[in-house]
């Protein structure tokens, strides 16, 4: 059944019209008949997706609407292709587009929008890392995009799922000092927040009302560690009474921000860690992932 859906997607992409304002089309590559397996055909499509694109034609390559539609189609095949094909596909795209400054600006903007913004339906950190790795390796992009790619790649690779979460120190209200690795004994929802952040307060309130999480905490199967990453201890202390007594609430004095040890582009930053301090979910945005069944499977 899975192979059937891959086949349908490839057929759909092959048949759908792709007409620009100038009436020209971006033709899909013709997959060789010798490639029969769906993943092989998907790999061929993504690797050769842009072969028929002339990036020197600025009526097309600078046309954001036209490029966006084709870029979305390009991304839609990637989940069905092997990882090495995805890497190759991004490298090919950037090699072609990198010769045109306006074109690479459009491509880069689309990659950030669709792959790195969590609100995007195509949000995918693995694909974004693949894109950034290809951008770092592509000499034609120049210093501007090369430097930005290196920075974003470093950020994206921090605390990836499967890796041990970066250690940090924090203090509790009673003055006791801990480190994450020393303190953590069981699966933990780590919440990094700012005391001066309205959105943080809203999300923390949602977590306080989350029935499955509250039950797991009550049963002792999950801990919640909420750490204020500001340097204003007085403000942090003034809000302690609003935090659930079953949670561990800490203060780090701004060191996580200073050290840039966690990605903090969107606060609160929420991570689900297992009992070995490995990241199971990075930057949890959808609280439905904390329902009973998913918690049991992940932890």
Regions found by a protein language model. Name each.
Residues 240-275:
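Short, internal strand/loop/helix patches
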Residues 1-26:
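Bacterial Sec-dependent N-terminal signal peptides
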Residues 178-209, 223-225:
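Short active-site neighborhood of thiol/selenol oxidoreductases, capturing the structured segment around
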Residues 269-299:
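Thiol-/selenol-based redox modules, centered on thioredoxin-like
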Residues 204-241, 254-259:
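Structural microenvironment flanking redox-active thiols in thiol-disulfide oxidoreductases
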Residues 21-173:
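Oxidative protein folding and maturation machinery
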């Amino acid at each position: 059944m899975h192979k059937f859906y891959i086949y349908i997607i490839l057929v759909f992409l092959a048949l759908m019209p792709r007409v620009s304002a100038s009436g020209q089309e971006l033709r899909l590559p013709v997959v060789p008949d010798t490639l029969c397996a769906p993943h092989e055909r998907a790999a061929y499509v993504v690797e050769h997706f842009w072969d028929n694109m002339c990036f020197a034609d600025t009526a097309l390559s600078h046309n954001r609407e036209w490029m966006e539609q084709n870029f979305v189609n390009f991304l839609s095949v990637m989940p069905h292709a092997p990882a090495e094909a995805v890497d190759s596909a991004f490298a090919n795209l950037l090699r072609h587009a990198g010769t045109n400054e306006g074109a690479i600006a459009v491509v880069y903007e689309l990659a950030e929008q669709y792959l790195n913004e969590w609100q995007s339906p195509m949000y995918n950190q693995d694909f974004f890392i693949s894109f950034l790795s290809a951008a770092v390796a592509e000499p034609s992009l120049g210093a501007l995009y090369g430097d930005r790619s290196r920075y974003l790649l470093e950020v994206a690779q921090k605390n990836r799922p499967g890796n041990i979460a970066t250690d940090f120190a924090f203090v509790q209200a009673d003055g006791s000092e801990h480190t994450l690795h020393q303190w953590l004994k069981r699966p933990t929802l780590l919440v990094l927040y700012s005391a001066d952040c309205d959105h943080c307060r809203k999300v923390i309130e949602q977590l306080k009302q989350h029935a499955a999480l509250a039950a797991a905490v009550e049963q002792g199967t999950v801990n919640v560690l909420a750490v204020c990453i500001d340097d204003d201890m007085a403000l942090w202390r003034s809000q302690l009474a609003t935090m659930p007594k079953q949670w561990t609430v800490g203060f780090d004095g701004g060191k996580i921000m200073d050290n840039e040890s966690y990605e903090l582009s969107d606060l609160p930053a929420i991570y689900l860690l297992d009992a070995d301090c490995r990241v199971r979910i990075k930057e949890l945005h959808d609280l439905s992932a904390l329902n009973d069944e998913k918690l049991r499977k992940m932890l």
